[in-house]
Amino acid sequence: MKSYVGIGKGNAADAVGEAVKGIGNPSCIIFLSSFGQIGEIAAIIAEKFPGVPSIGTLGTKLANGKYGDDNLVVLGFYDDAKTECGVINDISLCPVASIGDIKDKVNKVSPGRENTVCIEFCTNDEEKLVTTFNSCLAQKGVKLAGGTVFGVPDGKKPIVAYNGKIFEDSCVYAIIKN
């Protein structure tokens, strides 16, 4: 499976420009940003790559041997990987309401037991999400990895990004088949 990892620093536009330099034509983008820039970065990525699904989270990043809180990391996947992305809203209330949508996305990638993973980033209520995802993924042998956002300033609500937009009380995910 062909993939790309890029790192950028500076203001949102410069960070995205640097991080996607050489990415080409991805079929899916996953990014990790800082709290202060995630909204602008999500919008820039959606504008630069129209029609390409993207998910994003925030926290401390490690990529290409570099570590930091103030950088942007972009991971790109290409057509040799089948991908489906989505968002689950109101996860503190009823994430199971999204089971039908998750199952549809899983079926679209035609997962195999050893070649498919679901990566998720959530704002809260990870324990509810694990149950929701497992009900959709376990029977197909799809592995689940991910976590809760980190690095939210005091007094602010945790957020994640999906296709250029920011969401609270939500989970974004990518199902990736090699």
Identify the role of each PLM range:
Residues 1-178:
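Cofactor- and metal-binding active-site motifs of prokaryotic enzymes
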